[in-house]
Amino acid sequence: MKRYLAAIILFFLAAGFPAFATCTRIKPVDHGCDACGAPLNLGNIGLMNLRYQPAGTVLARSVFQVVPAVKNADPDRVLYECDLADKDQLFEVFATNGDSNVGGAWDMGNGYFQTYFPYTALKLVHVRSGKPFTRIWQKVPLTQYEIKGNKIEIRGRDFSPISAELIRTDKNNRSPGYNTFGCSSAAADNYTGAYNCNQPNGYVVFMGPGMNVPEAGQDSWNHYDTWGTGRYMAFGMNTAPVATLTQNMTQGCRVENYTANVIFPGISINALNEGHAVTAPLTITLACASETENLSGINSGQLSLGFQPSYAAWLQVQQLGLTSGDGLSRYLVSDHYDSQPSLAKGVGIQLQTSSGQPVSFLSWSSFSGNAGWRPVLEDAQAISGSQQSDEKLYQRRFSARLTKLPGQTVTAGQVDATASILIRLQ
């Protein structure tokens, strides 16, 4: 009798727990090894004196996907299959490479972590959740996937994009990490060359029924339990094409002043449809070391100036089919072009130099190469007012033009678009 009663009780206890199927790896591939993952596409990093690059200056930034990667070039390759009923049990788990002192161990402030390059720190952000990467393994729901019948297929492209922003710092943290793996610390202060410390900057790993990630919520300093399963997806400045570093501590330019808000006069829908446009001035004042004129250009070792749209605005022009193969665009649109009814549709902003040369807006998909950059002192006029004997002030004038977008229907509303002015040592 007791045995019968115990059996019945156990049956109902077991029935009280939900039954989840086990997710399956479909086409396993390990792109979690050190140089097997995705590149950040930051290109060449140019360091200048703190006078021209104060701590916090953006050196490079991009948005990338965990696939394509060195070991997995196909973003449509199915990596996992799960039951549709388990859709609320699927997660992305992510962290910096916390056991490496140049891969994500040392937070230099505001979520920027020391890298192998001296006086640089990197911030990674999980774009869909807006959460910055930290040493603590965070998990967020994975909500993008392909549904096939009663199954969910998870591909490389289904994981969130990740933004990478590298800034200038005024110090280094060369304290040892939990591991070294050949990189005892950041490179020497005067280092130039390739990012030859073969350590990623971060990882993402899938979590679902039967695919546990014990390190979730733990510190990646010494918790990386799932790494040996081959499920980690790595990415870093060390991954081909690797980042490189140049330095020039004697010359440089900085933005001293600029037109923060470019205000256009009103224009009717009919006028825009008839090909008319309105213009407004954009002025930038630059403070440059003497004889910087000789370094103004877009080739290696030269100083360039560029305009990068907000990531939201860049995504919008992509969706409108107005970017080139390298991600550049001749148009800047409102940051929330599609989501705010009060914003005008079918219109965008173009820039040109004072001599009439068209200016492209930079890409977010890659910071490599010189496409979209202009010589820093192109068409610049020397002006008085410098407070430093070894500096000169220059003024650059641009014309911003509000015009109809090709192939689009114009609707009434406001235009609220954002772009950043960047100076780069190529």
Question: Would you name each region that the model predicts?
Answer:
Residues 4-13:
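Sec-dependent N-terminal signal peptides
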Residues 14-18:
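N-terminal signal peptide c-region/cleavage motif recognized by signal peptidases
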Residues 2-3, 404:
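Basic side chains
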Residues 20-426:
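Mature extracellular/passenger domains of Gram-negative fimbrial/pilin and adhesin proteins
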Residues 1-2, 23:
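N-terminal hydrophobic targeting signals that begin at the initiator methionine
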